[in-house]
Amino acid sequence: MTKSLFAVLVAAGVMRAGPCEGGGTTGLPDGLVTGTWGGENAGLIADDTSAHVHIACTYGWVHQAIDPGSAGRFDVPGEYLLRAYPVAVGPSMPARFQGSVRGFVMTLNVVVTDTTAGGDSTVTLGPVKLLFGLEPKMQMCPICRRTGERRAM
């Protein structure tokens, strides 16, 4: 079975199972977003204290747990680098990581305050759809795999 077909079957099973499986609306046993979440040219790798996000050739960090709560929605602060590949350029900028989790499907937006644009303007990345347990399918830009790599950036 190809990875694409497997991903479709997993997604169909998750959507059919709905919010009553696992930990309620989020489907997460402890209620927190943890583990690897992957999609097309996007990914999120999280533990109970932080998360690292890639959307295309950009990346950012959340320095706290992501807790979607009983409604399955989250909005947490972090930082983001808009020009990250092939060579990181510029400072990390303030960002909001906003989204929802339903079952094992996450919808994510990142709203970055671009402080380098000569006045604070915002750049919105997303929405991207991520599936729990699916490896991110990055195109030309690699994703950081280990916690040490994430923190060293």
Residues covered by each model-derived region:
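Sec-dependent signal peptide recognition
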Residues: T2-V8
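An anionic, turn-rich surface loop/hairpin at beta-sheet edges
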Residues: V76-Q98
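Bacterial Sec-dependent N-terminal signal peptides
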Residues: K3, G13-G31
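Short solvent-exposed loop/turn micro-motifs enriched in small/polar/acidic residues
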Residues: W37, Y59, G90-S92
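N-terminal glycine/threonine-rich, aromatic-flanked beta-hairpin/loop signature
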Residues: E40-L82
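Extracellular Ig-like/FN3 beta-sandwich strand-entry sites
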Residues: G103-V105
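Tryptophan-anchored aromatic micro-motifs
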Residues: G24-I45, A51, V76, L108, ...
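Edge beta-strand at a domain terminus
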Residues: C20-G22, G60-G72, T107, V111-M153
